[in-house]
Amino acid sequence: MTILMKENLKKNNPRKPIRSPLFYVGDKYKLMPQLLEVFPNNINNYYDVFGGGGSASINVEAKHFHLNDIDKKVIELHHFLQEKSANIENFIFEMQLLINYYGLSHSEFGKNPVIEELKKVHKKTYFSKYNKSGYLELRSDYNSNQKRTDLLYLFITSIWF
């Protein structure tokens, strides 16, 4: 076992941490500035044994990464996002098509008049009111075909109500 002594470590260049596209309970995003202070430079193999959303792996510089999680679907999502990152514009386009197909809200295109009306009546739950039927259809479609990682990603990043 190698013990790292603080005096042998160089501080990594401080930068704003990168957020993971997977929000996950136990996310290390907010801790990354403090964690990076004690990480060595020139990491060859980085082992993220409790990978979750992957915030630690995204923010560490290393030659090789090894991500582990007890939930195989979490690892599947990481592989999916890694594959899609090769053509991010196409990935965004595909997600927008799915959002439109399921009739989910999409604030990138400005205010939605239906949502604005719901906001007047349902002050705290207007998004869930708007998205409920699309969300339920998306969930049903994913449960019918769990090989659709694109549906899983959209499902977990949808509004929870």
Model-found features: residue ranges?
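S-adenosyl-L-methionine
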Residues: 1-50, 55-56, 60
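Class I S-adenosyl-L-methionine-dependent methyltransferase module
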Residues: 63-161
